[in-house]
Swiss-Prot record:
Residues 183-193, 1417-1430 have a biased composition (Acidic residues). Residues 1-45, 64-101, 166-196, 1344-1403, 1417-1444 are annotated as: Disordered. The keyword rRNA processing applies. Residues 22-31 have a biased composition (Polar residues). Interacts with snoRNA U3. Interacts with MPP10. Component of the ribosomal small subunit (SSU) processome composed of at least 40 protein subunits and snoRNA U3. This is rRNA biogenesis protein RRP5. GO terms for molecular function: box C/D sno(s)RNA binding; box H/ACA snoRNA binding; mRNA binding; poly(U) RNA binding; RNA binding; rRNA primary transcript binding; snoRNA binding; U3 snoRNA binding. Disulfide bonds: none annotated. The gene is RRP5. The lineage of its organism: Eukaryota, Fungi, Dikarya, Ascomycota, Saccharomycotina.
Length: 1729
């Protein structure tokens, strides 16, 4: 019966399981109203909830249309069987509102992997963007991934086009890649391919941003797949394509509907969009999208419909409007995530609110999205039947197949705020952080909610709660953050709280792992469990061991524990570990490890060494790996000082090498390293290897690497490496040596004998054989044939077997000195095979057999010769005892009191003799009983002198080698050195007593004597067997001058009274403090106290000092430096850990801060405490605090700062002025204002510091009667406003009645804005900032006019004088070079920085940018004509040049400088051919920022100046080049340059532009132009090559300059070779490497020995180099040449002048004698002829 009913139901309801967009079944409430038409009573029989449902269902009837009765009839049937079955369909459940429990069972309150079926749609935020996909996070912290192919159709088409391009360009890409690999390196070949490919893919960060909201649809959930297909990791794959997530009918596209859009194209006023709906296109205006300029075709975003017309939709991205909600839908398919809807509240429980949307789809708002966790509060806040405005965040399918919703009422979700809240949340409390005190806020079906503080909430999943003992005070740990829910994800489970790290990404790079469990071993690496099995890690093959293991499984057993270190953790959380001892056992303080590029930069800046591993070999070097997954490149040239052809020959894969970093470029992901040591260390290594004597030198080394058969060692602090072969580890058998090799640890210190060395490769061989070491110490180990030939045949010699052959055993004493043992002298029987009986490096004892003096060869024997026993020598008796009572050795024993004679008095002991053959010593601690007995505390033994006889007591023996006290254990003999005491108490006592550690107590007072100093400690001798250590800070005498040398304050042997602070029984000494020492603390230190402090750290701004007793103080830079011109590093670098005197400036006991001064009383830079210590015009020292856009702030002291505005920084115009001033830079300035501490200003202008201070006047400074020049600011009907010069933007009004004596009619006809005028002040009103001016001529008296004229003339004269001084200074500079003729070069060899602005064009009133170029041109023209003639004095030529320059400077300058356009035009009428006037006119326009007018003037000048005036035209062209270089573009400069080359001499124009580039510091441009000029004129012009060489050497490119010399010799004809080489040699002497210059000159004088002028120039350069010996040697060589008498006279005079300047009287006489001898010899030769 039941079966038939079900069958019939299926037939009657064929559409019952179809799409739910069909008309819903009629509610039972509706039928009830039809059946009961007239209910009793006047009120409605329905509850408010039922009324709301009726209204919703009526709306749905209208929405779907009431087509026929058939649709309603079958819908009513299931009601009859509602109670007979629990498995009702979704429509049945929707129709049944009475069974609320059953309805709630179909709801989904939380999202998890099990509820996200394919087709589920969600609203989420982008939480991460990678190269391959987007990571989108939803509610409850679940994340999914969007692949590149599921973004949009437009984006997919971009990928398809890219794929086609990649296929077509494969060959080109391969070729390009090979070129790149030749030029530089990448990390590995595999990574190359990945990087190349990923670099070509579109960068998703340009299309999307973190925090962006998107609607997504699930296309794959691996956790729901069958077990056969199930992957190891759960992963949700999503699509955000509009066609997949926008499920709308035409009727649903109404205002406020959220819609996902993809950008199709960018238009002028907006972007066209793809909305994924057939027949519809979208549009968004520019103004409606925040960063429209960043919008790209293919990008996807969530929009809000604002308008719909026909087939187009207009959207925006504003979701903040509270009215943005949908009120109608065409079907339930339109209810999708992202929409704002009204949820009809049906039930309220402790888990949240359940209800319906549009009366069709059930939904729930969880308590975490209501932020109300109590059921009572929920019922108080919300009422059943009310509507709640929510946004849908998930649309899922329940087990019955029904559509259910998860909604949110959180404000940030309603507004869709773009900020990703997890960023801020995890910045505050990162993953792994533990909250100690949390309170329970509430709970629902899956989560426990905790209150972390007033603002933050967290939730704990039921699986991570654990056992809660105290619910009021919980500890929880952060596991993550859910940005959509705005809530922390926590765990209260104790096992999570105890973990050190929660994720592998939290494990720091370089972490030492003491106990790693091996889980598998293979050739591809080792798998480990770390942190007690919490994480897995892998060991790459190259990091298994320092030595290559063929069978790693033999050494590393599964289940065993090993020690490792984390080398990297990749983005997926995979941990890589190294087991190499060289990396595992490295201490943090030994070598810093590279783990990040920032870390690498710090290591490079500090010039420190680090460790790297050889990863891959390349032809031009090898790729090395660091920690953190970083790779670097080690070029062949940097592997070793010797030439390296193939890196495999010098290194091996997986080898750990110590490197220095040459270049770190984080942007290019590039690190260049070197194994080569620095030049200083290379020199040190060279000296060390040369000083090593094989067979004699014993050194201490550290083990840095182990191989199968040897140990690699290194000399500390030198870096020289050597090898100890396993056979040389001891004299024992090879088996024992191999066992010893295994026990050796990296870093172990060894002492051994060098037996061989290679000075070329700087490598040595060592031996640890004790037999060889002992012989070497005794110097009995033979090194040469002479050491062997005279030995007796019974003398044993220790050696080792070098090699074995048929001839016998070749036995070596060191690597080069070898003898032969014949087989018959090696073994007893010929049947024994010596190759099996012996092995290489075996220790042997040999005896001399035969020698061959002729060939210096010798034979040895392993068999000892038979020798007769010698008779035992009888020991002699005691000789000449000092104490006559001593007759024999038996009279001397422990406790004996005897007389002794002082042999010598040392600072800390008395050396005595008891007999002629018996010596002893009295330690200073055994002289005095008490401190008071000592008269001279610094030299206690000064009262004793040589040959004094003293009474002493024998207390023990003294070990001469170890300098230690030894008890007497055998009979005293002449070999003994006795330890004696002369203490009065000891002489009286019958017992022998020496103060030892056992009888010392803490607090006991002792007398100690300084034995030595070590760093910041003194070592004291308390007794011969007891030492004490005392810190300098713990000495009682705080007045000690610690700035002096410690040895002078506490000399050796000086006496101190100390107290025992602690006892170090392990090392056998006591720690002491001064007797009157008081432990300092914050409460005892007062301002003004002078305390000793130990320098701990030098920072950029301060010095940190240790005052003792864990009290530290800080000395600010202005309180630390005696001279501000030094940096803290320069002043205190050599004082780190030294104790220096300090003065307390302030004590902040609350913040535990002490400020100190390190400045002496007579500091070079005076102390400034407030503005009262300053006065205007005073010059002060300062240190730059910081730099901002308005100027720089300067420290004058710790509390006083000053400000320097940009206008006061420099006399020159500095375009990029900020790069000239850095924090903590020293500056010298002059005080401008100092009214208050907060209003101190300085000027750094050199002209104002050295001259008068130009203080701009303000309204309050101006008085009636003052005369000013100014500029017309504006012209009105009632007067003109004038901006006054030399004021702070002061403007005054000249009324129309004060313009002229006769009132003008039209002011605009007389004046224009910018005209220059002179005005007199009539009256001022500073309060209102008003000034009345007059321009009337009658107001200016004759005296005023005269004064003004005088002032103007004086100013002009000063300018001329300054210019003249500059030119004279330059000329004088050249004149100083004239003796060596280097001043005649086209290129000045000395530092030639021109006194012009850095831009190449100065707009100052002086206007010097044309004349200086003109001077330069004249100098170059004249220099080409000069020849190297040593006999001609050329100073007159320079003098004439100076006069010409001055004359050019003053030509055509009137007594009054032109001040307007009219003035210049008037000047041009009289001087149309004067380039100076034209250029001044151009400069005037440039001052007014009229650049285009300046260009027009230049063109006018070229047309106006007569064609014969080439020099004047040249000046205009140069001015145009200057103008375009400063104010134009590259194109305009190139155009002017090309034209100038056509009209003027091309070479001259090239050289002028080169000069302009250098002056304006455009060095790259200059380098390019040098190359082009040399190519064009290099075959005929020597000067261009010299200029190019000068340019390169000036910029520290000496090697490139030497290449240029080679190119010059190829390009120039042979006749010019000597000249160009000579000039390059002069350049090397002046700016480069003088040794290189000498080499060039030596080559010249060798090729042309008769060119005396070359010898003259050579001498001049050596004189400038100030190497007296070389100058004298050169003169000696010259006078031996065949030279004329005139030339000889010249050189002798020159030599004599040199020696007189040196003041060497002895050499002066020698030169005179040499000259006399020369004259005499030539006179005799002449007479003979």
């Amino acid at each position: 019966m039941v079966a038939s009913t079900k069958r019939k139901r299926d037939e009657d309801f064929p559409l019952s399981r179809e799409d739910s967009t069909k008309q819903p079944s009629t509610s039972s409430l509706v039928r009830n109203t039809e059946e009961v038409s007239f209910p009793r009573g006047g009120a409605s029989a329905l509850t408010p909830l039922e009324l709301k449902q009726v209204a919703n269902e009526a709306a749905s009837d209208v929405l779907f249309g009431n087509e026929s009765v058939k649709a309603s009839e079958p819908a009513s049937r299931p009601l009859k069987k509602k109670k007979t079955t629990k498995k009702s369909t979704s429509k049945d459940s929707e129709a049944s509102s009475a069974n609320s429990d059953e309805a709630r069972a179909g709801l989904i309150e939380h999202v998890n992997f099990k509820t996200l079926k394919n087709g589920s749609s969600l609203l989420g935020q982008i939480s991460a963007i990678t190269k391959q996909d987007l990571c989108i996070t939803f509610t409850d912290g679940i994340s999914g991934y969007v692949n590149l192919t599921h973004i949009s159709e437009e984006f997919t088409s971009i990928l398809e086009d890219l794929d086609e391009d990649m296929d077509s360009d494969t060959d080109a890409a391969d070729e390009k890649k090979s070129k790149v690999e030749d030029a530089e390196y990448e990390s590995s070949d595999d990574e190359d391919e990945k990087l190349d490919k990923s670099n070509e893919l579109p960068n998703l960060r340009r299309y999307f941003h973190i925090g962006q909201w998107l609607r997504c649809s699930v296309i794959k959930n691996t956790s729901l797949e069958p077990s056969t297909k199930k992957s190891k990791k759960k992963r949700i794959e999503l699509t955000i394509e509009p066609s997949s997530v926008n499920i709308y009918a035409d009727e649903d596209l109404v205002k406020s509907t959220s819609i996902q859009c993809a950008v199709k194209s960018i238009e002028d006023h907006g972007a066209t969009l793809d909305v994924g709906l057939p027949g519809f296109t979208g549009f968004i205006a520019k103004k409606d999208f925040g960063n429209f300029e960043k919008l790209l075709p293919g990008a996807v975003f969530l929009g809000n419909i604002t308008k719909k017309s026909d087939r187009s939709i207009v959207v925006n991205t504003d979701f903040s409007d509270k009215k943005n909600k949908i009120t109608q839908i065409s079907s339930i398919d339109a209810i999708i995530p992202g929409q704002i809807v009204d949820l009809l509240c049906e039930s309220i429980t402790k888990n949240g609110i359940a209800g319906k949307v549009f009366g069709l789809v059930s939904g729930v708002v969880n308590v975490s999205h209501l932020r109300t966790f109590s059921e009572e509060d929920l019922k108080h806040k919300f009422v059943i039947g009310s509507s709640i405005r929510c946004r849908i965040i998930a649309c899922l399918e329940n087990k019955s197949g029904d559509k259910v919703l998860i909604l949110s009422n959180l404000p940030h979700i309603l507004k869709l705020e773009d900020a990703l809240r997890s960023t801020e949340g995890l910045d505050a409390f990162p993953i792994g952080y533990t909250f100690e005190s949390c309170s329970i806020k509430g709970r629902d079906s899956e989560y426990l909610y905790l209150a972390l503080d007033d603002d933050r909430l967290g939730k704990v999943h039921s699986s991570r709660v654990g056992e809660i003992e105290n619910s009021e005070n919980l500890s929880s740990r952060v596991l993550g953050y859910s940005p959509v829910d705005d809530i922390y994800q926590l765990s209260t489970d104790p096992k999570y709280l105890k973990l050190k790290y929660l994720r592998t990404n939290d494990i720091p790079i370089g972490e030492l792992l003491p106990s790693c469990e091996i889980t598998s071993v293979s050739s591809s690496g080792i798998e480990l469990k770390i942190f007690n099995g919490q994480f897995k890690a892998s060991v790459p093959p190259l990091h298994i061991s320092d030595t290559r293991l063929v069978y790693p499984e033999r050494k590393f057993k599964i289940g065993s524990k090993v020690k490792g270190r984390v080398i990297s953790v990749n983005s997926r959380g995979n941990v890589h570990v190294t087991l190499k001892k060289s990396l595992v056992n490295i201490e943090d303080n030994e070598l810093p490890l590279v783990s990040t590029y920032e870390n690498a930069k710090n290591i490079k800046e500090k010039n420190e060494k680090t460790l790297a591993t050889i990863q891959v070999f390349k032809p031009n070097g090898c790729i090395i790996s660091f920690f953190g997954g970083l790779s670097g490149f080690l070029p062949n040239s940097e592997i070793s000082e010797v030439f390296v052809k193939r890196p495999e020959e010098h290194l091996r894969l997986g080898q750990t090498v110590i490197v220095k970093l040459l270049d770190v470029d984080a942007d290019r992901r590039r690190i260049i390293a070197t194994c080569k040591v620095s030049n200083e260390q290379a020199a040190q290594q060279k000296d060390t290897i040369e000083n090593i004597v094989p067979g004699r030198t014993i050194i201490t080394v550290h083990v840095i690497e182990k191989t199968k058969d040897s140990v690699i060692v290194e000399i500390p602090d030198v870096g020289l490496r050597g090898v100890i072969y396993v056979g040389h580890l001891s004299d024992s058998r090879i088996e024992q040596n191999r066992a010893q090799l295994k026990k050796l640890r990296i870093g172990t210190e060894l002492t051994g004998l060098v037996i061989d060395k290679d000075t070329r490769t700087r490598v040595f061989n060592m031996s640890l054989k004790s037999s060889l070491i002992k012989d070497a110490k005794k110097e009995t180990l033979p090194l040469t044939y002479d050491d062997v030939k005279d030995l007796n045949k019974d003398v044993p010699m220790h050696a080792y077997i070098k090699s074995i052959s048929d001839k016998g055993l070749f036995v070596a004493f060191n690597g080069k000195f070898i003898g032969l043992v014949l087989p018959s002298y090696a073994v007893d029987s010929r049947d024994i095979d010596i190759s099996k009986a012996f092995y290489i490096n075996q220790s042997v004892t040999v005896y001399l057999l035969r020698t061959d003096d002729k060939n210096q060869k010798f034979l040895l024997s392993l068999k000892a010769p038979k020798v007769k026993e010698e008779k035992k020598k009888v020991e002699s008796n005691i000789e000449d005892p000092v104490d006559s009572s001593i007759k024999s050795w038996d009279d001397l024993s422990i406790g004996s009191i005897v007389k002794a004679k002082i042999k010598s008095v040392k600072k800390n002991q008395l050396n005595v003799i008891l007999a002629a053959n018996l010596h002893g010593r009295v330690d200073i601690a055994e002289v005095f009983d008490t401190y008071e007995e000592i008269t001279d505390k610094k030299q206690p033994l000064s009262n004793y002198k040589k040959d004094d006889v003293i009474k002493v007591k024998i207390i023990g023996n003294h070990d001469v080698k170890s300098h230690k006290f030894l008890p007497i254990t055998h009979k005293i003999s002449k070999a003994s050195v006795l330890e004696l005491s002369m203490k009065p108490s000891e002489l009286k006592s019958k017992e022998v007593h020496t103060k030892s550690l056992e009888e010392i107590n803490i607090g006991q007072e002792l007398t100690g004597f300084v034995n030595n100093s070590s760093g910041n400690h003194l070592w004291l001798t308390i007794s011969p067997v007891l030492k004490a250590r005392i810190s300098l800070l713990d000495l009682a005498d705080n007045d000690s001058n610690f700035s002096e040398n410690i040895e002078s304050v506490f000399p050796l042997g000086s006496a101190l009274q100390v107290k025992v602070a602690s006892i170090d029984r392990e090392h056998g000494f006591v720690n002491a403090i001064g007797k009157s020492h008081v432990d300092i603390n914050m409460s005892t230190i007062k301002v003004g106290d002078e305390l000793p402090g130990r320098v701990l750290k030098i920072a950029e701004k301060y010095v940190l000092l240790d005052l003792g007793n864990k009290v530290t103080g800080i000395s600010f830079i202005t309180d630390a430096l005696n001279d501000f011109s030094l940096t803290l590093k320069e002043a205190f670098e050599d004082k780190i850990n030294n104790v220096i005197p300090t003065t307390v400036l302030s004590v902040d006991e609350q913040n535990k801060k002490i400020e100190l001064s390190l400045r002496p009383a007579t500091a070079k830079t005076r102390s400034i405490k407030s503005h009262e210590d300053l006065k205007q015009g005073e010059i002060v020292d300062g240190i730059v605090k910081n730099v901002n856009d308005k100027g720089i702030f300067v420290y004058l002291s710790r509390k006083v700062e000053a400000f320097v505005p940009v206008s006061k920084l420099s006399d020159s115009y500095l375009k990029e002025w900020k790069k000239f001033y850095k924090p903590m830079q020293y500056v010298l300035g002059k005080v401008v204002t100092c009214d208050e501490d907060s209003r101190i200003s300085l000027t750094l202008r050199e002209s104002e510091i050295n001259g008068d201070l130009k203080v701009l006047k303000t309204y309050s400074d101006i008085k009636a009667g003052d005369v000013f020049e100014g500029t017309i600011k504006s012209v009105t009907d009632f007067g003109v406003f004038v901006k006054l010069d030399n004021t702070v933007n002061v403007t005054g009004l000249a009324h129309i009645t004060e313009i002229a004596d006769k009132k003008p009619e039209d002011l605009s006809a007389l004046f224009g804005v910018g005209d220059r005028v002179k005005a007199i002040v009539l009256k001022t009103n500073p309060e209102k900032k008003q000034i009345s001016l007059s321009l009337k001529a009658s107001h200016f008296s004759k005296e005023a006019e005269l004064a003004s004229t005088t002032t103007t003339t004086t100013t002009v004269d000063q300018l001329e004088k300054e210019d003249e001084d500059e030119v004279m200074a330059d000329a004088g500079f050249n004149d100083s070079d004239s003796e060596s003729d280097i001043g005649d070069q086209n290129t000045e060899v000395a530092d030639r920085k021109p006194e012009t602005s850095s831009d190449g064009l100065s707009l100052s009133a002086g206007f010097d940018w044309t004349a200086s170029i003109l001077d330069q041109a004249q100098e170059e023209e004249e220099s080409d004509q000069d020849q190297e003639d040593f006999t001609e004095n050329k100073k007159h030529k320079h003098k004439r040049r100076k006069e010409n320059v001055v004359q050019d400077k003053t030509i055509d300058i009137n007594t009054r400088a032109p001040e307007s356009v009219a003035d210049f035009e008037r000047l041009l009428i009289g001087n149309p051919n004067s380039s100076v006037v034209w250029m001044n006119y151009m400069a005037f326009q440039l001052q007014l920022s009229e650049i285009e007018k300046a260009r027009e003037l230049a063109e006018r000048a070229l047309k106006t100046i007569n064609f014969r005036e080439e020099a004047e035209k040249l000046n205009i062209w140069i001015a145009m080049l200057n103008l375009e270089n400063t104010f134009g573009t590259e194109e305009t400069l190139e155009e002017v340059f090309s034209r100038a080359c056509q009209y003027m001499d091309s070479y001259t124009i090239h050289t002028k532009l080169l000069g302009i580039y250098e002056i304006s510091e455009k060095f790259d441009k200059a380098a390019e132009l040098f190359k082009a000029t040399a190519k064009k004129f290099g075959g005929e012009k020597v000067s261009i090559w010299v200029s190019w060489g000068d340019f390169l050497i000036s910029h520290n490119e000496e090697q490139e300059a030497r290449t240029i010399l080679g190119n010059a010799l190829k390009a120039l004809p042979k006749r010019n070779h000597i000249e160009v080489v000579r000039k390059f040699a002069q350049l090397e002497f002046a700016k480069g490497d003088p040794e290189r210059g000498r080499s060039l000159f030596e080559g010249l004088v060798a090729d042309a020995p008769k060119r005396i002028d070359l010898w003259n120039v050579y001498v001049d350069q050596e004189v400038k180099a100030k190497d007296k010996k070389k100058v004298e040697d050169l003169f000696e060589r010259i006078i031996t040449k065949k030279i004329t008498r005139k030339q000889a006279k010249f050189f002798f005079n020159k030599w004599l002048q040199f020696e007189e300047s040196e003041g060497d009287e002895k050499t002066i006489e020698y030169v005179k004698a040499k000259a006399t001898e020369y004259v005499a010899s030539h006179e005799s030769q002449k007479a003979d002829e």
